[in-house]
Amino acid sequence: MGKHRDLRSSYPSSLRDHNNLYQVSRFEEVEDPTIEDFINDNATISFGIVYFKNIRLKNPNFGFPYISTDRMLAGALSDIDYISDNGRVLKCSGEFTLVITDVDLELIMRIYDADKIDINLCLTAEAAPLPKWEADFIDEYFKNKSDYKNILKDLEKAFAPDDDVFDANNDLTKVKNMFNAIYGLHAQDPCKGLLIRDEDTDEIEEEEIDISEEIDKYYGFHKNRFQKSSRGFLPYSVGVWCTAYSRRKIFSEIFIVCPPSGSNSAGRGLYVDTDSLFYLDNEATEELFEIDNKRCYDEAIKNGDYITDNKGNIINYNSFDEEDEFMRFKFLHSKCYAYEQKTPEGAKLKVTAAGIAARKLKGMKDGKPDYIYKEEEVKTLERFNDHFTFKECGSTKSGYIKEELKTVNIDGHMVECGNACIITPTQKTIKDFGLKQKVYQFEKMKTGRN
């Protein structure tokens, strides 16, 4: 049987759970850095430029490669003969560099072998837990999310009127958005120029900026000491390491199902996303997941990293929750998969495809909205393939009209109008992002010749 598990509130969990997260000193360069300088257990965070030569998976059967093909090619130092799948490197002959964090290098070294790894540049800063005011703020919205989920479940169980369920679902969505926006505030570009509109041509351009000056303004560095400014009260570095720690957490769950250097890697893991994993379960795997969840729960109780919801339940961060079971699973590429969910009534098709609407309004039936859902359009798992076209739930396209603000007469009505965006439905076809084997010719790409 297949199972699907999700990390509970992945990014907020990483914000609340990790001590080495909040940058409290300026990044300093390490002289003659080693891998040990780059990856350490002290209260520091590190990033820099790392050199790699001739990499390959430790186990060819491991189904979750880590290194991005695009980032590898962007840092190419020679011709590179590589094999990639779904935008991730399986094997590469050649030399390249990556700009990565300490967490990334730790994961890469667990998954890949390389002929050579060197640290070209290592920048390190002291780090500390989030300030209490932000931790409390995250807890507040975590509780709100948990409470609204309970309210929605109670309404659904009681077969409440559709309007009540709809309103409760909207409330939950708003709370989730605010909860996740806390991480988003740490992920704003610290060096973004103002957008300037030319009143004559109506063209919009971004102002040119001096990056080093903008970084100094953002972090408020004065007289060689770290002094946060009002503009930099939520450091960008927190967003960087939050996502890095979240990647490490999901890979720790992947390694339970598929050890990167063991013989059990083949066939057990099916698909991984930012915070979810689809896999083939067995008794030993489920026991390991529950042991890990128990460890996270005990640590949360000890450290106070939990909330109590409106039903008196203790809800902790970092749990890897079981979502559903499935009988068949089909993966095409990132954010594009389908499976037959196991239910008491039998198999139920579930489809996930980026950019595809969950449903489309066909009209009214018996006084109620009549929708067609994306699963109805796909019909069966066998029909879900590369080049399948969603004709009903496809997507939308936008057309923009530039016009001076004016008042016009439309059928006797005086209507004020101006710039407009016309949104119309459109079809969407699934693309093929399969296995690729290519030779990247460094000299041709460097000079712009093909």
Predicted regions and their residues:
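Conserved acidic
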Residues: 1-450
